[in-house]
């Protein structure tokens, strides 16, 4: 496990303990009973691909540990509207406070402003966070294989699916992919960023693509910065993408999305 991931997870344990002091897990469970049905996250991606278009998960991210603040003028609702107009199929919203300058409210603001399904992008290690994600309005959660053991992967993914959410299982190498395909989550995210060096290479997706079962949808994540990157991946049969940094640095995120994915 990388040094930065170790730090993030240690902080996450503290954060969960702090949140439990204010809202119990039992209270979150009770709230989940009265919520409307989630928007279909995997279904939205699959529908876009079936139409012949690239399925884009557009990310709303203020900052990252490696790059610092990406966008000073950060208005999640406006960004969400821009992404929907630009052709995004789904959204991803960072809610980690300490390392990514995210906030739970950013997810709610973004989701309320559009009709797109939303992924809660955070470091999920405990059932409490799965219930919390559902209460916040998330339609999908992220599970990072590098952060979890096999029992946690099974338990957390099963709980999310039971609550009606989808699960994006993120891997960085072949060993993690072999673990990921043992659970029934519909989405496999291949992160092109090396967690140890932070170097990014699209070869990670291209090398591992053939190992993803046909009944799972592969999502390529990180390092997709230009239309040439998109064309290279699409030529190899990759049809779903998670992109954040390139859009966050653009004056008009949705226009940047449209230019990267839909103007040839």
UniProtKB/Swiss-Prot annotation:
Any one GO BP annotation for this protein: L-tryptophan biosynthetic process
EC number of this enzyme: 4.1.1.48
InterPro entries xref list: Aldolase_TIM, Indole-3-glycerol_P_synth, Indole-3-glycerol_P_synth_dom, Indole-3-GlycerolPSynthase_CS, RibuloseP-bd_barrel
Pfam families: IGPS
KW Lyase (keyword) present: yes
Keywords noted in UniProt: Amino-acid biosynthesis, Aromatic amino acid biosynthesis, Decarboxylase, Lyase, Tryptophan biosynthesis
Pathway: Amino-acid biosynthesis; L-tryptophan biosynthesis; L-tryptophan from chorismate: step 4/5
PROSITE patterns hit by this protein: IGPS
UniProt keyword annotation of Amino-acid biosynthesis present: yes
Catalytic reaction equation(s): 1-(2-carboxyphenylamino)-1-deoxy-D-ribulose 5-phosphate + H(+) = (1S,2R)-1-C-(indol-3-yl)glycerol 3-phosphate + CO2 + H2O
GO molecular function, one term: phosphoribosylanthranilate isomerase activity
Family: Belongs to the TrpC family.
Protein name as it appears in the record: Indole-3-glycerol phosphate synthase
Organism: Xylella fastidiosa (strain Temecula1 / ATCC 700964)
Biological classification of the source: Bacteria, Pseudomonadati, Pseudomonadota, Gammaproteobacteria, Lysobacterales
Gene name of this polypeptide: trpC
